[in-house]
């Protein structure tokens, strides 16, 4: 009997140690998949932050842009009782209940990438990213200065409030006619949709993501022989769009530094676990602009999986 009792105690101790070893300090719930060119860079930042801070992390995301599934992932993260949760916040209305449940459970939450205008209303203390409307204003101002009169804003994630704000900011900065083209996130479909619009007198195109929409729009312009005559700019960066910028085919890429958006929340939680302190407000990682003048020096960083801040953006003091 004593032998059995000792064996049971040993088994319970082993289970407790195993659970402790499997416990996750920080869970990241993103709307972007780690195999997406943009989000793979953000995940690299998460991984490096976890290594540098000595914390265990888990990166999760729905298979597609799906707010119902993302809310379930946040709920699941809460049930695991981590020391912190990092989320993107593309739709505060859809995710608000789950975020508030995490905070009510005593789990601190940091938002990154999407959500600069909404994080505080949900009780989140800090956001890491760029202010989307202001970034759009800067892009619009650049296209206006380049002589643009009629623009197309290509939205590949319809329902993502952050992308809506990018287009709204672009429209304000541009000042001319701006139409919104809603698409799926399939590059082939985006290319076809942009190609179908090229006969509509557009002299300017802004895409809201480089790896999917930006490269697809560039292919449409190349196929139609309109590179240069139709100005193209994009949010975010990808190796293909960086090369296009270096070749003078793209007016600008708006760099929000997604590597830092992944890294900094983990670093913040690392310090929080040690000292109990956390910054408040928006920790700005962008926007910065990559242009044909500075694209070459940025390409070397892209090859290493991190895209770094390049230059300050124009500010719109009336926003």
Regions found by a protein language model. Name each.
Residues 19-23:
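Sec/Tat signal peptide C-region and signal peptidase I cleavage site
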Residues 25-45, 49, 53, 58-74, ...:
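Extracytoplasmic "Venus flytrap"
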Residues 53-62, 153, 173-187:
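Short beta-strand elements in bilobed, periplasmic/extracellular small-molecule ligand-binding domains
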Residues 70, 126-151, 187-191, 237-241, ...:
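Hydrophobic alpha-helical segments within soluble ligand-binding/sensing domains
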Residues 75, 86-104, 170, 185-244:
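Hydrophobic alpha-helical
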Residues 92-134, 236-251, 299-301:
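Flexible loop/hinge segments that line or gate small-molecule binding clefts
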Residues 173-176, 260-311:
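Hinge/cleft segment of the Venus flytrap/periplasmic-binding protein
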Residues 309-319:
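Single conserved hydrophobic/aromatic residue that forms the stacking wall/gate
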């Amino acid at each position: 009997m004593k032998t059995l009792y000792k064996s049971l105690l040993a088994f319970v101790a082993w289970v407790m140690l195993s659970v402790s070893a499997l416990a996750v300090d920080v869970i990241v719930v993103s709307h972007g998949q780690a195999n997406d060119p943009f989000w793979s860079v953000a995940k690299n930042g998460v991984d490096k932050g976890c290594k540098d801070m000595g914390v265990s992390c888990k990166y999760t995301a729905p298979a597609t842009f799906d707010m119902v599934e993302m809310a379930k992932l946040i709920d699941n993260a809460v049930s695991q009782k981590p020391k912190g949760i990092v989320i993107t916040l593309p739709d505060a209305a859809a995710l608000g209940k789950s975020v508030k449940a995490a905070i009510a459970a005593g789990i601190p939450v940091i938002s990154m990438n999407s959500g600069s205008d909404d994080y505080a209303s949900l009780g989140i203390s800090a956001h890491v990213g760029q202010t989307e409307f202001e970034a759009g204003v800067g892009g619009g101002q650049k296209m206006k200065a380049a002589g643009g009169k009629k623009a197309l804003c290509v939205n590949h994630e319809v329902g993502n409030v952050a992308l809506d704000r990018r287009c709204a900011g672009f429209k304000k900065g541009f000042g001319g006619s701006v139409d919104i083209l809603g698409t799926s996130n399939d590059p082939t479909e985006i290319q076809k949709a942009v190609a179908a619009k090229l006969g509509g007198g557009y002299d300017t195109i802004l895409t809201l993501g480089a790896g999917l929409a930006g490269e697809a729009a560039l292919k449409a312009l190349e196929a139609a022989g309109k590179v240069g005559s139709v100005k193209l700019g994009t949010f975010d960066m990808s190796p293909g769009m960086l090369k296009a910028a270096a070749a003078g085919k793209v007016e600008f890429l708006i760099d929000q530094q997604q590597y830092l958006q992944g890294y900094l929340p983990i670093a913040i939680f690392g310090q929080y676990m040690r000292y109990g302190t956390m910054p408040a407000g928006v920790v700005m990682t962008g926007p910065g602009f990559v242009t044909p003048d500075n694209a070459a020096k940025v390409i070397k960083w892209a090859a290493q999986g991190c895209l770094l801040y390049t230059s300050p953006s124009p500010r719109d003091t009336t926003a």
